Amino acid sequence: MDPLIAPLAFLLAIALGCAVGSFLNVVAYRLPEGLSLVHPPSRCPHCGHRLGPKENVPVVGWLWLRGKCRWCQTAISPRYPLVEAATGFLFALTCWRFGWQWQTFGYWILISFLISLTLIDWDTMTLPNSLTKPGLVLGLLFHLLLGWQRGHWIVPLVEAIASAVLGLWLFDLIRMGGSLLLGREGMGDGDPKLASMVGAWLGWPSLLLTTFIACFIGSIYGGLKLLLGTLQRRQGFPFGPFLAIGALISLFWGEKLITSYLNFVTPQF
């Protein structure tokens, strides 16, 4: 990319990501409640005042309001601008990692699904089918288009389907094993579907890496919560956010991590 154009391209990616992040905040709040995603327009969750154009600008609107509703002065959660900024950062990181090609737009879709599912799971301990199923289908379609571009569409599609099935079966086994060990539901039924979606998008090697990272980070989180006394031994916590973190790490650095691991465990002669 031309050095003069690159900064503008990254700024465009950040701006687009922040705008998408603003919509993802709406999805995370309204979808679990069964509300429309487009009507009514954004408003203060406390007093119901409709936000104006300036107040709706991602990140900047929250800063301009100093984190409070202009009418009722109730504090507005900083999560809103943080989600917007994080989405903008991830969109720019995708451009930096993969360049400006059509696959980048596909990965933006994956990132959007992962963020919205993370927020919903964190809030409600659920991963709605209305997001995991379309995310799975779009992942398969992504690999269908990728294969068509390369002249052999059937192979990437079959690999994506196999990876999706592996994700579903793997996490169903983990779920059943956890239930046997704990004597209760060890994992929600949405986690296998999210794993299936990740497999469809990233393939089985990255799915396995995602699983390892998610279990590792999730174990640390759960252990710390137990030590601090903020989590009971038989109390569950959302696992979807850790799957999403693992998927993002696999998306950006999975190939290098897998190669480094194979070089480490493979004998050198």
Swiss-Prot record:
Keyword annotations for this protein, in alphabetical order, are:
Cell inner membrane, Cell membrane, Hydrolase, Membrane, Metal-binding, Methyltransferase, Multifunctional enzyme, Protease, S-adenosyl-L-methionine, Transferase, Transmembrane, Transmembrane helix, Zinc
Binding-site residues for Zn(2+), renumbered to this chain: 44, 47, 69, 72
Q: What is its EC number?
A: 3.4.23.43, 2.1.1.-
Q: Which Gene3D superfamilies match?
A: 1.20.120.1220
Q: Where in or outside the cell?
A: Cell inner membrane
Transmembrane parts of this sequence: 4-24, 100-120, 127-147, 154-174, 197-217, 238-258
Q: Per the record, GO CC terms? A: plasma membrane
**Which Gene Ontology terms describe the biological processes this protein takes part in?**
methylation; signal peptide processing
Membrane topology per record: Multi-pass membrane protein
> What is the protein's name according to its record?
Prepilin leader peptidase/N-methyltransferase
Give the encoding gene's name: hofD
